[in-house]
Amino acid sequence: MGDQALSFLKDFLAGGIAAAVSKTAVAPIERVKLLLQVQHASKQISAEKQYKGIIDCVVRIPKEQGFLSFWRGNLANVIRYFPTQALNFAFKDKYKQIFLGGVDRHKQFWRYFAGNLASGGAAGATSLCFVYPLDFARTRLAADVGKGSSQREFNGLGDCLTKIFKSDGLKGLYQGFSVSVQGIIIYRAAYFGVYDTAKGMLPDPKNVHIIVSWMIAQSVTAVAGLVSYPFDTVRRRMMMQSGRKGADIMYTGTLDCWRKIAKDEGANAFFKGAWSNVLRGMGGAFVLVLYDEIKKYV
């Protein structure tokens, strides 16, 4: 096996392991965030039963759906996240070779920074093309608030993908894809670009203390998450449209979704669940740091 192929596989393995561990750890926060984002577009949650905020959601979920329901959709998330994060990291390094070949980070800072932004954004958009149906299914499973199997909209990952495909075809599994690409480019560009640039400007980038790495990563994930959050809210709302017919369809398209959320719910609605997203971002920061640590041993 060539050195390049071995390096690619190491990136894939290290990124995937780090992602699976961290996403399982923050799964309850992830579900709370998703419910707050999409409850307004859910057929299962009437206006009077909507969650009032993070604490209300955390208290009611175990009472109404059982404690283990905090991890509803987590299996789909791990399955989805393994290739997503692994491909992101692996492609990121390939794109860095394209955008940053021959660039001196000390003498050409802005070109180095722009190259990191481009490689991070391109990596995120590329991997999204492959795994979007899994991301869609994870969202719909997490948004399913039925207690028993008889009250659930879907009985699992396979059931979700099958039902939506039969109802809407492949298009249904890619609902909200365009706004997802916009959001993922913004998020990944900051996530990878700023992180790599900050680490690259340190005296010894390959031997950075784990606490310093974590602090840099934490700042990056928090900022990137908040900047791209409105795009995430719109794409989740669009995902909730699949499988609906006639009067049940809330939004005719992405632009209509942006417009209706702003008009009917106000600008704050774009940031519902954003605080839980910041907490969840700790998991994202942990992924970056864990990835660097795993690569030292793989």
UniProtKB/Swiss-Prot annotation:
It is a multi-pass membrane protein. Under cell death induction, transglutaminated by TGM2. Transglutamination leads to formation of covalent cross-links between a glutamine and the epsilon-amino group of a lysine residue, forming polymers. The modification N-acetylglycine is found at residue 2. GO terms for molecular function: ATP:ADP antiporter activity; oxidative phosphorylation uncoupler activity; proton transmembrane transporter activity. The chain crosses the membrane at residues 8-37, 75-99, 110-130, 179-199, 211-231, 274-291. The matrix-open state (m-state) is inhibited by the membrane-permeable bongkrekic acid (BKA). The cytoplasmic-open state (c-state) is inhibited by the membrane-impermeable toxic inhibitor carboxyatractyloside (CATR). Proton transporter activity is inhibited by ADP:ATP antiporter activity. InterPro entries: ADT_euk_type (IPR002113), Mit_carrier (IPR002067), Mitochondrial_sb/sol_carrier (IPR018108), Mt_carrier_dom_sf (IPR023395). It catalyses: ADP(in) + ATP(out) = ADP(out) + ATP(in); H(+)(in) = H(+)(out). It comes from the Eukaryota. Signal peptide: none annotated. Belongs to the mitochondrial carrier (TC 2.A.29) family. Monomer. Found in a complex with ARL2, ARL2BP and SLC25A4/ANT1. Interacts with ARL2BP. Interacts with TIMM44; leading to inhibit the presequence translocase TIMM23, thereby promoting stabilization of PINK1. This is ADP/ATP translocase 1.
